[in-house]
């Protein structure tokens, strides 16, 4: 059995977060990945993430891992299989085989988050960034 580490990115607008929602795997990034792995290996394969995200949150470089139940695919094979079946709003940036003890959640060393806020009455509305910002209609209390 191989332990695969993948770095992924996604546009979270259509998802209720990374973690699978019971009975509704299409609404979570984890659910999408696990559905593809289930198809790939003909058995359920769990995807573990370094962190969970909330609804609508995007990821630029999120680390996940899974244990392949058989040695059918190498890194290129895994990458190509995901490329074939992933929706346009999720991409695989890299795939590598790691030590069997690697666990993306328990071995995470750091997390970073970027919050982008647009003040509603600012001089110009963001055009290209409009799906990556939160619109704020009230005064932001930075001290709080």
What do these predicted ranges mean?
Residues 1-144:
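Structured-RNA-binding interfaces characteristic of tRNA pseudouridine synthases
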């Amino acid at each position: 059995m191989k332990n695969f580490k993948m770095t992924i990115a996604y546009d979270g607008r259509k998802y209720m977060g990374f973690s699978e929602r019971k009975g509704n795997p299409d609404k979570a990034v984890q659910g999408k990945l696990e559905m593809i792995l289930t198809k790939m290996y003909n058995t359920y394969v769990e995807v573990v993430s370094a962190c969970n995200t909330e609804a609508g949150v995007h990821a630029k470089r999120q680390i996940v891992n899974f244990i392949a139940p058989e040695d059918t695919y190498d890194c290129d094979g895994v990458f190509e299989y995901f490329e074939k079946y992933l929706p346009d709003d999720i991409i695989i940036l890299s795939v590598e085989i790691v030590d069997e003890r690697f666990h993306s959640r328990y071995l995470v060393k750091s997390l970073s988050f970027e919050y982008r806020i647009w003040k509603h009455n600012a001089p110009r509305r963001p055009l290209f960034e409009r799906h990556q910002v939160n619109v704020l209609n009230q005064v932001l209390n930075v001290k709080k």
